[in-house]
Regions:
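A cross-kingdom feature marking solvent-exposed beta-strand/loop segments within repeated
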Residues: 178, 183-196
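Catalytic-core region of carbohydrate-active enzymes that cleave or remodel glycosidic bonds
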Residues: 1-73
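Extended carbohydrate-recognition surfaces in non-catalytic/accessory domains of CAZymes
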Residues: 56, 68, 74, 79-82, ...
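Generic, well-ordered alpha-helical scaffold segments in large soluble proteins
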Residues: 28, 35, 90-94, 155, ...
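Conserved small/polar residues in nucleotide/adenosyl-binding loops
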Residues: 197-203
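Short helix/loop capping segments that flank catalytic or ligand/cofactor-binding pockets
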Residues: 10-11, 50-53, 78, 177, ...
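Short, glycine/acidic-rich beta->alpha junctions
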Residues: 19-25, 148, 169, 191
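Aromatic-lined ligand-binding clefts that engage carbohydrates, nucleic acids, or primary amines
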Residues: 162-179, 199
C-alpha cells in the first residue's frame, strides 16, 4: 500500500511553486493499479491549511506556505486541471463492467470585486490587548499561545548611552524591532538571520 502518493510537493515561502508533470503522476498510479496496489492520492483536491499551521522543515529551516494546492488534479479553487482529466481517463480503464464515471461538474464561477478604497485605519500599537508582565522574556507557550505573533515590550532608561547594542538570539521565526514606534530591523530565520548583535539603539 502507498499511503501518500504525492501529486506535487510542498510550497515554501520565498521559493517557486512546486509542480509535478501530469504524465509522471498518472503513470505512477497506473503502475500501482496494474499491480493491484492500494494507494491514497495526496492530494486529490488542493485545499488550504488555515491559520498558522503551515509548519516548516528542518534542519535547513524552510517555512511552508499555508496553501495546500500541491499541484493537485483539482486545484485549491476547485477547478479541474490537465492532471485531473489524464487521471480520469486512466481510471475509466479500471471500472467494473457496466460502470461509468459521472459527468464533470462545471467550473466554479469567479466573482469580480469592484475597486474600493479604505477610509479608516487602526494602528497596531494603538489596538493592543492588556499586557502581561514578566521580569524575564517568556516563550509564547507560557501564555497558552501555541502559534501566531507575540509582542515583547520594555521601557528603556531615559538616557541611553551612545553605542548601546540590543542583543537578540534564536529568533523563531520572524521578528521586527521597534523603538518609539519606528522600525529598526527585521530578522528572518529563512535567511539565516536568527540573531542580531549589532542593533544600535537610538539615543533620543
Amino acid at each position: 500500500m502507498c499511503s501518500e502518493f504525492w501529486s506535487g510537493w510542498f510550497d515554501h515561502w520565498g521559493r517557486k511553486h512546486e509542480t509535478r508533470p501530469a504524465k509522471d503522476m498518472v503513470q505512477g498510479i497506473k503502475d500501482m493499479l496494474d499491480r493491484n496496489i492500494s494507494f491514497s492520492l495526496y492530494m486529490t483536491h488542493g485545499g488550504t491549511t488555515f491559520g498558522h499551521w503551515g509548519g516548516a522543515n528542518n534542519p535547513a529551516y524552510s517555512a511552508m506556505c499555508s496553501s495546500y494546492d500541491y499541484d493537485a488534479p483539482i486545484s485549491e479553487a476547485g477547478w479541474t486541471t490537465e492532471k485531473y482529466f489524464l487521471l480520469r481517463d486512466l481510471l475509466k480503464n479500471y471500472l467494473p463492467a457496466g460502470a461509468a464515471l459521472p459527468e464533470v461538474p462545471a467550473a466554479l464561477p469567479v466573482i469580480e470585486i469592484p475597486e474600493f478604497h479604505f477610509t479608516k485605519v487602526a494602528p497596531l500599537f494603538s489596538n493592543l490587548p492588556e499586557a502581561k508582565h514578566s521580569t524575564d522574556i517568556q516563550p509564547m507557550e507560557q501564555f497558552n499561545q501555541g502559534w501566531g505573533t507575540i509582542l515583547y515590550r520594555t521601557t528603556l532608561p531615559e538616557a541611553v548611552a551612545v553605542g548601546t547594542v540590543l542583543k537578540i538570539t534564536e529568533v523563531h521565526d520572524w521578528a521586527q524591532v521597534y523603538a518609539d514606534g519606528k522600525l529598526l530591523a527585521r530578522l528572518d530565520r529563512r535567511k539565516g538571520a536568527v540573531s542580531y548583535t549589532h542593533l544600535t539603539l537610538p539615543t533620543n
